[in-house]
Amino acid sequence: MNSSGLLCDNERPRHRPFLIGVSGGTASGKSTVCAKIMELLGQNKVDHHQRKVTIVSQDSFYRVLTPEQKAKALKGQYNFDHPDAFDTEFMCQTLKDIVEGKVVEVPTYDFVTHSRLPEKICVYPADVVLFEGILVFYTQEVRDMFHMKQFVDTDSDVRLSRRVLRDMNRGRDLEQILTQYTTFVKPAFEEFCLPTKKYADVIIPRGVDNMVAINLIVQHIQDILNGDICKWQRGSVNGHNHGRSLKRGVAEHGENPSGSSSNLTKRPLLEPSTRPH
C-alpha cells in the first residue's frame, strides 16, 4: 500500500475472471460486438485500471515476421489466417496469467507494416474478459480456458465487402485484396475457423445488427457482475452452466407463435469489423 492508502497494481487482491471467447470469420464483426457490449455496460468510458469488463484481441499474438515473410505480406502473399500465423504458446501463457488475475502486457500489431509496435497494451484484472479472434477456438488448450464461447456468424458476402473496404482504406489495391481472399482467407476460414463453430455456446447471426442477441448477452454479463461470478468461483456455477442458461434465454425470445423455434434458437445468438487480414 502506498502513502495515500491506495493499493498499487501488484498489491490488488487477485480474482479469477469469467473468460468469454468470441470467434467468427474475418470481418464478421467480432471486435464491434465486443465494443458494443462494453458500451452497453458503460465500461467504455471507465478508466482502464478500473474496468470490470475488458477486451483482448488475438491479433496481438501474430508472430513477428522474418524479412522474407514480411516481403510476402506486403504483396498479399502471406497467410495470416492460418493457425501457424499466431504465437499460440505466448497466447496460452498470457491467457493463463489473465485467468490468474495478473496484470499483463500484450503487443500492439500494425496491420499496415505487418509488425509489432513498440507500444504495448496493459491489461488489468477484470471480472469479465472478452477474448476475440478468428481462431480462438482452434487450439484445445485455449478453447478449454473459456467459461463461455460465442461465434459471430455473418454472411460471407458481407464479410468480403467489409474486408475490401477496410483493406482499400489501408492503401491496398482491389486485385491484391481479392487474390489474398481467394488464395488464403476463404480456404482458411473453411478449414480452420468454420469447423470451430460447433464449440460455441452462443451463435450470433448478423453480429452487432442483432440487438436482441446483444442485449441478452449484456444482461448475462451484468448478472455475472452482480454476483453470479462469486457463485461460480465457489464452484456452484461453472462456465458450461452459464452457456446453457443463456441458450435457454435466447430460445425463449426466439420461439415462433406456432411453438417452433426460429433459426435464432438453434443455438444462442452475437458483431462491424476490424479484422486485420
Curated annotation (Swiss-Prot):
Enzyme superclass (EC): transferase
E.C. designation(s): 2.7.1.48
NCBIfam families (UniProt xref): PRK05480.1, udk
Keyword Transferase: yes
Pathway: Pyrimidine metabolism; CTP biosynthesis via salvage pathway; CTP from cytidine: step 1/3; Pyrimidine metabolism; UMP biosynthesis via salvage pathway; UMP from uridine: step 1/1
InterPro entries: P-loop_NTPase (IPR027417), PRK/URK (IPR006083), Uridine_kinase-like (IPR000764)
Sequence similarity: Belongs to the uridine kinase family.
Residues at which ATP binds: G24, G25, T26, A27, S28, G29, K30, S31, T32, D209
Pfam families: PRK (PF00485)
UniProt keyword list: ATP-binding, Kinase, Nucleotide-binding, Transferase
Function: Phosphorylates uridine and cytidine to uridine monophosphate and cytidine monophosphate. Does not phosphorylate deoxyribonucleosides or purine ribonucleosides. Can use ATP or GTP as a phosphate donor.
Catalyses which reaction(s): uridine + ATP = UMP + ADP + H(+); cytidine + ATP = CMP + ADP + H(+)
Region called Disordered, residue ranges: 241-277
Any one GO cellular component localisation term in the record: cytoplasm
UniProt name for this protein: Uridine-cytidine kinase 1
GO MF annotation list: ATP binding; cytidine kinase activity; uridine kinase activity
Residues at which substrate binds: D81, Y109, H114, R163, R172, Q180
Gene Ontology terms describing biological process: CTP salvage; UMP salvage
Gene: uck1
